[in-house]
UniProtKB/Swiss-Prot annotation:
One of its GO terms (molecular function) is N-acyltransferase activity. Homotrimer. It is an enzyme of class 2 (transferase). Pathway: Bacterial outer membrane biogenesis; LPS lipid A biosynthesis. It comes from Campylobacter lari (strain RM2100 / D67 / ATCC BAA-1060). This is UDP-3-O-acylglucosamine N-acyltransferase. Pfam families: Hexapep, LpxD. Its EC number is 2.3.1.191. It catalyses: a UDP-3-O-[(3R)-3-hydroxyacyl]-alpha-D-glucosamine + a (3R)-hydroxyacyl-[ACP] = a UDP-2-N,3-O-bis[(3R)-3-hydroxyacyl]-alpha-D-glucosamine + holo-[ACP] + H(+). Disulfide bonds: none annotated. GO terms for cellular component: membrane.
């Protein structure tokens, strides 16, 4: 799509070079044929090093855009990006017919849907009612249980277990908002990558990335009823217990343990070998090799002392 067409769609004037834009991407990873956006002071620091061919930008930060990059000045870059994301969204059902490659040793049970250009390796088992979208690849000895949904472009390693009714690769919870309180969907063009030996519990959901990939690294085990948001990166050999919620763009190091009903607020990092006790609410970056608990999050030993003081104070008041 030409820059002039994008400008017309957004209702803004543009008189510069009419370059071709092929996709949307983040400031960090965009190439010259891709468009990105900057929605605030925090991200404005990334503009100088961005390789994007065009950037949606507010008037406040337009002077930060280099002469080699097209700047499209809009009132709300995030909203404009959301509107454009629909134009660049990949189709849910491909019109392009590409034969899938299914190993002879794979076992596919009845009522399984397999899309276009799917790669299924040796000794894979896919149980009844599963949905496998276009361009999915599944490594050897992986088992996909009944009614699991694997959306387009998902990459699954070897010897993974995906239990019943899990959903891998659906759109994340991303919206831009108008001044009147209307919400516009951000279409997600990334994917999900599950590395080798990953287990995903029943009714767990892992959202695809807006750009690039949501990644679950080798050996991680995820319990039932867990939500992993878009663009998360879960390190090697993590344990995530039932009903936990990992908000978008959270990064967990290796061997992190998330106790039952624990959660992160998103856009933060948890260090290697950290443990979050049940119902812990993580709202900031955490160092590794420590045990945390409570809300707001603190060292678990401090949280227990705090709880003991509350109980003592309450008891003394009523004696």
């Amino acid at each position: 799509m030409k820059i002039s067409e994008i400008a017309k769609f957004l209702g803004i004037e543009y008189y510069g070079d009419d370059i071709e834009i092929t996709a949307l991407n983040s400031l960090n990873n965009a190439s010259f044929s891709e468009l990105s956006y900057c929605d605030g002071e925090k991200n404005s620091k990334k503009i100088a090093s961005s390789g994007a061919g065009a950037i949606l930008i507010s008037k406040e930060f337009e002077n930060l855009v280099s002469k080699d990059c097209v700047k499209l000045v809009v009132d709300n870059p995030h909203l404009s990006f959301a509107l454009l994301s629909k134009l660049f969204a990949k189709p849910l059902i491909s019109s392009e017919k590409k034969q899938s490659n299914i190993a002879k040793s794979a076992k596919i049970m009845p009522n399984v849907y397999i899309g276009e250009n799917v790669q299924i390796a040796d000794h894979v088992v896919i149980m009844a009612g599963a949905y496998i979208g276009d361009n999915v690849s599944i490594g050897e000895y992986t088992i996909i249980h009944p009614n699991a949904v694997i959306y387009n472009d998902t990459k699954i390693g070897k010897k993974c277990h995906l239990l019943a009714n899990c959903v891998i690769g659906s759109d994340g919870f991303g919206y831009a908002h108008t001044k009147n309180g209307e919400h516009y969907k951000i279409y997600h063009n990334g994917n999900v990558i599950l590395e080798d030996f990953v287990e995903v519990g029943a009714c767990t959901t892992i959202d695809r990335a807006v750009f690039e990939s949501t990644i679950i690294k080798q050996g991680t085990k995820i319990d039932n009823l867990v939500q992993v948001g878009h663009n998360c990166e879960i390190g090697e050999n993590c344990l995530i217990v039932a009903q936990s919620g990992i908000s978008g763009s959270s990064i967990l190091g290796k061997n992190v343990t998330m106790g039952g009903q624990s959660a992160t607020s998103g856009h933060l990092e948890i260090g290697d070998f950290a443990t979050i006790a049940a119902r812990g609410g993580v709202t900031k970056n955490l160092e590794g090799a420590r045990v945390y608990g409570g809300f707001p999050i603190m060292l678990q030993k401090d949280w227990l002392k705090f709880q003991a003081k509350i109980i003592t104070a309450f008891r003394d008041k009523h004696e």
